[in-house]
Curated annotation (Swiss-Prot):
This is Threonine--tRNA ligase. PROSITE patterns: AA_TRNA_LIGASE_II, TGS. One of its GO terms (cellular component) is cytosol. Zn(2+) binds at C334, H385, H511. Catalyzes the attachment of threonine to tRNA(Thr) in a two-step reaction: L-threonine is first activated by ATP to form Thr-AMP and then transferred to the acceptor end of tRNA(Thr). Also edits incorrectly charged L-seryl-tRNA(Thr). It comes from the Bacteria. Its EC number is 6.1.1.3. Keywords: Acetylation, Aminoacyl-tRNA synthetase, ATP-binding, Cytoplasm, Ligase, Metal-binding, Nucleotide-binding, Protein biosynthesis, RNA-binding, tRNA-binding, Zinc. Pfam families: HGTP_anticodon, TGS, tRNA-synt_2b, tRNA_SAD. Residues 1-61 form the TGS domain. The modification N6-acetyllysine is found at K286.
């Protein structure tokens, strides 16, 4: 009979099989009331599942991350329950958990309107408030198939036929008259599912295949309590204000159009930000001793077959042909960098060789997934590739890590989550090679005092990797940086160097990306700063304005002087009221506004205002220039007097 060991090391002995709920009740009624599920020997199970042998048990509550995920999954079933009551002929497809919520794909003979979504949410609340028990039954494959076939649920039948073995016992979850199929676990009672909101609808192909029927996807968010739900909705409201697509239009940074889906038309001010970002990255490349190269954006398909990209990636590659040869427009830079490495004999003395490129890449992303600058088809990678010996891996990874943190800190990103992905089951290379490679990555992180978590088995078949995920001011995660070891590509493309023993050896290749793509990172920065770019990045850093025509000459002189000092400056000599001009340039997020009236002309000074409305008073022009140059040169995130 089972001995249950709890997280604090205490044990409870039973003379019969028990469920997590039984154990929770044994500990106390408060824990039983809070119990959502259990974790038995590391595996999540339903609160009602029986434990027959000795086991380690943790009780899962709404305070746990697992508990919140279970609540969200059960809210997807609640959505199914409600939609079948409102529109009984709906066919249910899949309803998984996603970040911050859930969705359900449904086949419905009407297009859902906003009013429909509101009615659906209302019915969900009505059902949840009944606090009914969710009943789980493990049944045979045949019984599950018969259940859904009798209910006309063709998508569930398809899942059973194509994805579930006939000797398996699927879990059915009964919500009163509604039944759904799932691995689980789910909440034992709907009292846990009161704090949710339906967010939007979208189209989605069954199984993600455009040859299949287009279904309607209903998105929702769910939280453990009302406070957390309201906080999330508030963050969404703030995110909408910061939407880079909206700000990009307001500030005239770029646009997209139907004739070039997923391709960016950079306007002058947006391109200024892009080029300033390039200058910054180049300064770091020089500091960390990288070469900068430029490869062709199109190469023969034969090369992509050698690399393995054609077999595994061809659907995402654009192709063209000329003179009976098929070419691929590059989706990444690495094969081109190996070609550059292969030119001329390399010695161990030439290593490490650090090769960087602002590579123009293209990927055939599905049109439905395109999203402003965040998801595009044409983008510029800031990646680099380091060719080194096995002995040099640790030092080179160390350098990559320092560079990542050096660059992210410039933009004020302080919360960075790091994950180390280790060997998958299918891989190349010996266990000894993987042992050393994984240890090198781990030691490099430890030497930099960086906490990290392992993602066991999540590495690529050709090497382990480190992923850096930064969090913005709204606590949204953006996976940007990677350091990936590659023991495969150099060998596939015949890269080699002459070792100390005069023998030819294959170099290790380190793929390194920091910003990810320039376009996406500018989108992230636009939302992080809400368009209030730090002065060094701002397209226009200073606007000088006159009050009347009599100051026009003085404004032109100052404009030239600031321009000569390397400051991006514009003169506004329009015959408009000064209050109107100030308001307009404030909305354009120009960091500094210099106002010139007769008093300023006489004294040779300027009245200085910031875009945040702060009046810095009258200042000497040379003092303004000196302070601005210092702010720009240091890439400060703060403005004068902040």
């Amino acid at each position: 009979m089972p001995v249950i060991t709890l997280p604090d090391g205490s044990q409870r002995h039973y003379d019969h099989a028990v469920s997590p709920m039984d154990v929770a009740l044994d500990i106390g009624p408060g824990l039983a009331k809070a119990c959502i599920a259990g974790r038995v020997n590391g595996e999540l199970v339903d609160a009602c599942d029986l434990i027959e042998n000795d086991a380690q048990l943790s009780i899962i509550t709404a305070k746990d991350e697992d508990g919140l995920e279970i609540i969200r999954h059960s809210c997807a079933h609640l959505l199914g329950h409600a939609i079948k009551q409102l529109w009984p002929h709906t066919k249910m497809a899949i309803g998984p958990v996603i970040d911050n919520g859930f969705y359900y794909d449904v086949d419905l003979d009407r297009t859902l309107t906003q009013e429909d979504v509101e009615a659906l949410e209302k019915r969900m609340h009505e059902l949840a408030e009944k606090n009914y028990d969710v009943i789980k039954k493990k049944v045979s494959w045949h019984e599950a198939r018969e259940t859904f076939a009798n209910r006309g649920e063709s998508y569930k039948v398809s899942i059973l036929d194509e994805n579930i073995a006939h000797d398996d016992k699927p879990g059915l979850y009964f919500h009163e008259e509604y039944v759904d199929m799932c691995r689980g676990p789910h909440v034992p009672n709907m009292r846990f599912c009161h704090h949710f909101k339906l967010m939007k609808t979208a189209g989605a192909y069954w199984r993600g295949d455009s040859n299949n029927k287009m279904l309607q996807r209903i998105y929702g968010t769910a939280w453990a309590d009302k406070k957390a739900l309201n906080a999330y909705l508030q963050r969404l409201e703030e995110a909408a204000k910061r939407d880079h697509r909206k700000i990009g239009k307001q500030l005239d940074l770029y646009h997209m159009q139907e004739e070039a889906p997923g391709m960016v038309f950079w306007h002058n001010d947006g391109w200024t930000i892009f080029r300033e970002l390039e200058v910054f990255v180049r300064s770091k490349l020089k500091e960390y001793q990288y070469q900068e190269v430029k490869g062709p954006f199109m190469m023969d398909r034969v090369l992509w077959e050698k690399t393995g990209h054609w077999d595994n990636y061809k659907d995402a590659m654009f192709t063209t042909s000329s003179e009976n040869r098929e070419y691929c427009i590059k989706p990444m830079n690495c094969p081109g960098h190996v070609q550059i490495f292969n030119q001329g004999l390399k010695s161990y003395r030439d290593l490490p060789l650090r090769m960087a490129e602002f590579g123009s890449c293209h990927r055939n992303e599905p049109s439905g997934s395109l999203h402003g600058l965040m998801r595009v088809r044409g983008f510029t990678q800031d990646d680099a590739h380091i060719f080194c010996t096995e002995e040099q891996i640790r030092d080179e990874v160390n350098g990559c890590i320092r560079l990542v943190y050096d660059m992210y800190s410039t933009f004020g990103f302080e919360k960075i989550v790091v994950k180390l992905s280790t060997r998958p089951e299918k891989r190349i290379g010996s266990d000894e090679m993987w042992d050393r490679a994984e240890a090198d990555l781990a030691v490099a992180l430890e030497e930099n005092n960086i906490p990290f978590e392992y993602q066991l088995g999540e590495g690529a078949f050709y090497g382990p990797k480190i992923e850096f995920t930064l969090y913005d001011c709204l606590d949204r995660a953006w996976q940007c940086g990677t350091v990936q070891l590659d023991f495969s590509l150099p060998s596939r493309l015949s890269a080699s160097y002459v070792g100390e023993d005069n023998e030819r050896k294959v170099p290790v290749m380190i793929h390194r990306a920091i910003l990810g793509s320039m376009e996406r990172f500018i989108g992230i920065l636009t939302e992080e700063f809400a368009g209030f770019f730090p002065t060094w990045l701002a397209p226009v850093q200073v606007v000088i304005m006159n009050i009347t025509d009599s100051q026009s000459e003085y404004v032109n002189e100052l404009t030239q002087k600031l321009s000569n000092a390397g400051i991006r400056v514009k003169a506004d000599l329009r015959n408009e009221k000064i209050g109107f001009k100030i308001r307009e340039h404030t909305l354009r997020r120009v960091p500094y506004m210099l106002v010139c009236g007769d008093k300023e002309v006489e004294s040779g000074k300027v009245a200085v205002r910031t875009r945040r409305g702060k009046d810095l008073g009258s200042m000497d022009v040379n003092e303004v220039i000196e302070k601005l140059q210092q702010e720009i040169r240091s890439r400060s995130l703060k403005q004068l007097e902040e």
